[in-house]
Curated annotation (Swiss-Prot):
It comes from Hypocrea jecorina (Trichoderma reesei). HAMAP family: PyrE (MF_01208). 5-phospho-alpha-D-ribose 1-diphosphate binds at residues 32, 82-83, 112-113, 116, 118, 138-146. SUPFAM superfamilies: PRTase-like (SSF53271). One of its GO terms (molecular function) is orotate phosphoribosyltransferase activity. Its EC number is 2.4.2.10. This is Orotate phosphoribosyltransferase. Keywords: Glycosyltransferase, Pyrimidine biosynthesis, Transferase. It is an enzyme of class 2 (transferase). PROSITE patterns: PUR_PYR_PR_TRANSFER (PS00103). It catalyses: orotidine 5'-phosphate + diphosphate = orotate + 5-phospho-alpha-D-ribose 1-diphosphate.
Amino acid sequence: MATTSQLPAYKQDFLKSAIDGGVLKFGSFELKSKRISPYFFNAGEFHTARLARRIASAFAKTIIEAQEKAGLEFDIVFGPAYKGIPLCSAITIKLGDVAPQNLDRVSYSFDRKEAKDHGEGGNIVGASLKGKRVLIVDDVITAGTAKRDAIEKITKEGRHRRGIVVALDRMEKLPAADGDDSKPGPSAIGELRKEYGIPIFAILTLDDIIDGMKGFATPEDIKNTEDYRAKYKATD
């Protein structure tokens, strides 16, 4: 990737890995919202050992930065089913590798879509959430539904949710209830921050992607992505 980007080295490395691995693609993609996006991010493609190490490393650096700058403290890394499951385990291992003095005792947990009624039972797998500070990790926040479900499950256990870290913040406003996308509006991340009062961090934002694109992408892809940001950027 060219050196014109102002992104920190680990963000540049993550962005390049996402593009080279087919995780981040440019073109024309219809989203669940029916919007036509010029880019698409699918963290499920981080399935090779090399790419899994890259995403775990980028998450770990983002989390440690959040600890240093925002005082983020946690005992458990929680991954909502399904994409959050491999993320939480890989991230926990990486945190123990890069900061063993502080994070070697961090555990991970994830949820089942349906509660198990035999064996150990319940819908939480991994470390018990009882009395623990919980950090949620996932790929993106689109409508926020999965994160609300995770927060409610954690709260139901009577535990402390301390924050959320995602791979990508699309910085995109939620679809308007009346279908009029010309109206300004908040993002799903902004609404979650407001509703639950918890910090949310991202490895990359759409602004980061556009900054990084200038080192390698075609002028058409850059313009399409900038136009999409201008049309759908959230107010928060």
